[in-house]
């Protein structure tokens, strides 16, 4: 099974993010599944890829050429697919995925998982789609809390 994970290339402010990312990576590797991710060696992306590899799993990174030019890629992964731009990257990650998980991240992470959720909603894609709301990043305050 190919598990596409969307998450940031930054460490994040909450240490529980790194722990959760490493736990997911270990599970992916030990379960015999394959990780599909953004290809970066930095931050949470790097932590995820490293934990999958350490658990004996395969990692496919999908990264646009301009990130390769800036040397952001993780060279030790199983396979690196280079795309011309971010749009092609998103499409390739969707094409390869069987399951989609988004960790808390920035606008790019939100854009990526929103596109998958839209495709599922329109019945253009049949796949589990998980918005992992760790640290309650995606929870808006209730009107009472404002």
Which residue stretches match the model-derived regions?
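Acidic/glycine-enriched connector segments
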Residues: 44-103
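Short glycine-rich anion-binding loops that position phosphate/pyrophosphate groups of nucleotides
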Residues: 8-11, 41, 65-67, 105-108
């Amino acid at each position: 099974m190919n598990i596409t994970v969307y998450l940031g290339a930054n460490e994040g402010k909450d240490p529980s993010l790194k722990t959760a990312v490493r736990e997911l990576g270990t599970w992916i590797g030990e379960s015999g599944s394959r990780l599909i991710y953004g290809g970066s060696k930095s931050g949470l992306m790097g932590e995820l890829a490293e934990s999958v590899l350490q658990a004996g799993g395969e990692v496919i990174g999908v990264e646009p050429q301009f990130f390769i030019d800036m040397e952001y890629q993780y060279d030790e992964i199983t396979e690196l697919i280079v795309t011309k731009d971010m749009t092609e990257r998103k499409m390739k990650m969707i094409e390869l995925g069987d399951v989609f998980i988004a960790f808390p991240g920035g606008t790019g992470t939100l854009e990526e998982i929103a596109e998958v959720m839209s495709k599922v909603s329109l019945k253009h894609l049949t796949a589990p789609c998980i918005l992992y709301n760790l640290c309650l990043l995606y929870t808006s305050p209730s009107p009472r809390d404002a």
